[in-house]
Design a protein with these regions (language model features):
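N-terminal pre-domain and mature-chain start segments
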Residues: 2-5, 101-103
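Short cysteine-rich clusters marking metal-coordination/redox-active sites
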Residues: 4-7, 29-32
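Short Cys/His-rich Zn2+-coordinating modules
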Residues: 7-17
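Short linker/helix segments within small regulatory modules
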Residues: 16-26
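Short metal-binding segments enriched for Cys and/or His
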Residues: 30-51
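Amphipathic alpha-helical segments in structured regions that serve as interaction surfaces
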Residues: 44-53, 64-72
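Charged, low-complexity interaction regions
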Residues: 56-59
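Short flanking/linker segments adjacent to small metal-binding domains or redox-active Cys/His motifs
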Residues: 61-103
Length: 103
């Protein structure tokens, strides 16, 4: 499955045509790039937190941050390009599985 290298969004269904740019790592979604560049990692992290708050955690900001960290740390791009917000607590396996089941 083709997914965004910065957030993991699958390019299927309603997101099928949301590739914003291609990089040597792979595709980046339209939400995580601007003017031909990948957005700042802090902005992508904030977008991930907002997504989880709105769609999964019923407003639990702390859980949304932990889910975002776990998600981003699972992606090769962030393993090779770490940044400060990735340091901190991550969601447990069960928290992450429960969150993904809601999507």
């Amino acid at each position: 499955m083709n997914t965004c290298i910065t957030c993991g969004m699958p390019f299927t269904g309603e997101h099928e045509n949301e590739i914003g740019m291609e990089t040597s790592y792979g595709p980046v979604c339209i939400h995580d790039c601007e003017d031909g560049d990948i957005k700042e990692p802090e902005d992508i992290f904030a977008g991930g937190v907002a997504y989880f708050v709105d769609n999964v955690t019923d407003g639990d900001f702390d859980l949304a941050e932990r889910l975002t960290r776990r998600n981003m740390l699972s992606l090769e791009y962030w393993q090779e390009n770490p940044f400060e917000e990735l340091e901190g607590p991550v969601a447990s396996e069960s928290e992450y599985a429960e969150a993904m089941a809601k999507l």
